[in-house]
Amino acid sequence: KGVEGVLGTDGIGITKTDAKGHYWLKSNKCYEVVYVILPSGYNVPTQAAMPKFWAQTSTDVDSEAQHDFELIQASNDNHTILVATDIHLTNRNLSPNDRQQFREGFVNELISTYTGKQNVYCFNLGDFAHDIHWYRNDIGWAESLNNHPSDDINGLPCQFWSTMGNHDNDGHTPSGDDVDLRASGPYRKMVGPTHIAMNIGKIHYMLLDDILYYNGYTGSNSNVDSQFGDCNYNAGFRPDMLTWIERDLSYVDKNTPIVVGMHIPLVNWDGSSRNYEFNNTSNWTSFMNLFKDFKEVNFITGHTHQTRFRAVPGYGTNMDEHNIGAVCGVWWSSSAR
């Protein structure tokens, strides 16, 4: 039976299902995906710990296609959110190997703690892989999630929802027009959309890509093997993503608590100002202003491999940031856990 009022999106436009659960969306297929914004009271099926909420589209803007999604009714007002970031699987010659450490440590701990519990979700805030090792050690997202799923997240007793980090971009993408979109192509093909939203219980969650990747070449980075550039980037949001965020939030009541996950922190380390990596002040301000009228907004971020809590300066008491430490610890090179 179709579900009425469910939001669907291509990462730019947003549409709503009719009384029969049907939707229609005209798309320029920029992101080559279509997906569901999870409605409250529902879950989606899981395959190897990955939520099945999206589908890949063709690049032909004139072709039509039908993509159906399964929703499973769930009483998820009471739920558990786990946050993981900076896992950095590299397949380097460590003893034990980092993938083995990840499986025997992080994955097994979650299995022993959460198996049998309902409505558990894990948010991955980026840098699951590590770009310079994609080609050096054959360890990209594809190897982690497709060719060897039993070695990594398969078996987790929770759904593994993700967004990108800077190291999840493909450094073999030549710089130039829309390099940010092109470099995220492997991620979108393997993992799914780079910016997503979901309503779980009475909370609205968003996972956003805040990496503007340009991969310029200065000749200064000797660590990138045969890549086309230096894997460099700025923090920020694509204009079409800012528009999408605004459209998504137009469906959210101002009193609804919001949790926003992304990779790069919004706030500088001492909490005094915006993070310097957001070098475009107007982009940062435009993003923050989208949330200023909501009663309670919490941002969860990674990237620094440190743990900090701070209020967002200039936005009263309704916005806080929780910067989360790295799953990889000291790059998987320490015996301490």
For each of these PLM feature ranges, what is it?
Residues 3-26:
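Short, acidic Ser/Thr/Gly-rich low-complexity loop/linker segments typical of extracellular
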Residues 24-34:
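Short Pro-Gly-centered beta-turn/loop motif in secreted/extracellular proteins
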Residues 30, 41-135:
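N-terminal active-site segment of His-dependent metallophosphoesterases
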Residues 41, 52-56, 134-252, 278, ...:
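Extended active-site neighborhood of metal-dependent phosphoesterases/phosphodiesterases
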Residues 86, 126-127, 165-166, 263, ...:
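Active-site glycine-centered loops adjacent to acidic/histidine catalytic or metal-binding residues
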Residues 210, 261-266, 303-304:
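Short, well-ordered beta-to-alpha junction loops that form the rim of enzyme active sites
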Residues 249-274:
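Short acidic, glycine-rich surface-loop motifs adjacent to enzyme active sites
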